């Protein structure tokens, strides 16, 4: 039996390494066709992004592609770019904030299979969705956290806002955060410049009506104003008709809720990566959720087959070169007579 096996192997070897390489390449390709996989854990992400659509987000002190745009437009462009940085299998939902609460527009869906739907929903979010001039950011953030906590997969919250409270927030009468800080992870993303600018006034159809004047807005919290009223309070006092990024206020809210804060900087041109770190923030390892997955290993036997075929080709070239050298030596050793 052993002698027969040895004889079989000897006959196979006598066929030459050329056929061995070809057979091994065919075997490797056959393995690749079996779709081999291995169990791994993939870091995936699950977010709900809430966009502030109140009137101060229409101030054009943001930049996209080197051009001034409204704060909301910069936020939308940065998010549109960041969608491409989330790995397939991750989920993202969209919401908006207006008046004093957040609203869920689209529950988290898988980003690759639903990229067009996410971008279409994002494209339809604009300032016309704000049905009131109020902008109670702290309450909106707290309700956004409640939404994220109530969703089945407990996504992280990304709350995008300029932090402009209208009417102004008095620390003595401000809302209290009743949840456990850090129960919902995520980011507060600040949008806007640091120089106060007039807030555009628009009608329900989004048409411009000029800018808000000092005598058209509240410059103090109504409850505090009524308690501390003086004869001069009837006159406009303050600059609440102007808006800038309220970074200090947003940092306080982040500390209170256990979220992180980042400022949205210049966004790259459409189609490119955001100039800010929004994409990196959405894919921060601390927000990743290891999910069991199967890694495709077809590339390994396919690569092996390619290398075997390349080795066979090189072997044939070497054999051909050897034959040519032998023929040349034979011709030199036996010259024909003239």
Predicted regions and their residues:
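Alpha-helical transmembrane signal-anchor/signal-peptide segments
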Residues: 38-55
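…and closely analogous acidic/polar surface helices at protein-protein or active-site interfaces
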Residues: 44-45, 57-91, 110-114
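VWA/integrin I-like adhesion module and closely mimicked acidic/polar interface patches used
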Residues: 163-248
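Second-shell loop/turn segments in exported
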Residues: 61-72, 81, 104-108, 125-134, ...
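Short beta-strand-loop
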Residues: 90-124, 147-148, 274
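C-terminal signal-anchor/stop-transfer transmembrane helix together with its immediate cytosolic
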Residues: 2-43, 280-338
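Juxtamembrane amphipathic/hinge helix adjacent to a transmembrane helix
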Residues: 46-50, 255-298
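DG-centered beta-turn motif at the end of beta-strands
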Residues: 29, 52-54, 75, 94, ...
């Amino acid at each position: 039996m052993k002698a027969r096996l040895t004889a079989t192997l000897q006959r196979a070897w006598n066929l030459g390494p050329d056929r061995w390489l070809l057979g091994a390449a065919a075997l490797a390709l056959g393995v690749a066709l079996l779709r081999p996989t291995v169990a791994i854990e993939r870091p995936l992400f699950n977010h709900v992004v809430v966009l502030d659509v109140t009137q101060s987000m229409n101030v054009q002190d943001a930049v996209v592609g080197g051009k001034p745009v409204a704060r909301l437009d910069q936020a939308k462009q940065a998010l549109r770019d960041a969608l491409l940085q989330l790995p397939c299998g991750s989920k993202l939902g969209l919401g908006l904030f207006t008046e004093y609460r957040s609203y869920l527009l689209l529950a988290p869906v898988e980003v690759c299979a639903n990229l067009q739907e996410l971008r279409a929903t994002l494209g339809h979010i604009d300032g016309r969705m704000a049905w009131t001039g109020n902008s109670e950011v702290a309450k909106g953030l707290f309700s956004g956290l409640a939404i994220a906590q109530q969703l089945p997969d407990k996504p992280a919250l990304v709350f995008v806002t300029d932090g402009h409270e209208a009417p102004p927030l008095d620390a003595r009468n401000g809302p209290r955060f009743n949840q456990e800080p850090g129960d919902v992870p995520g980011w507060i993303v600040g949008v806007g410049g640091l120089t106060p600018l007039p807030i555009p006034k628009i009608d329900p159809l989004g048409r411009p009506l000029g800018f808000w004047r000092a005598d058209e807005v509240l410059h103090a919290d109504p409850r505090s104003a009524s308690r501390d009223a003086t004869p001069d309070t009837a006159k406009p006092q303050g600059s609440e008709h102007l808006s800038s990024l309220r970074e200090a206020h947003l940092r306080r809210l982040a500390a209170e809720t256990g979220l992180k804060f980042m400022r949205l900087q210049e966004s790259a041109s459409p189609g490119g990566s955001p100039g800010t770190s929004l994409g990196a923030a959405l894919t921060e390892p601390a927000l990743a959720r290891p999910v069991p997955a199967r890694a495709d290993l077809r590339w390994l036997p396919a690569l092996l087959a390619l290398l075997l075929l390349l080795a066979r080709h090189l072997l044939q070239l070497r054999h051909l070169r050897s034959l040519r050298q032998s023929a040349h030596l034979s011709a030199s050793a036996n010259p024909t007579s003239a």
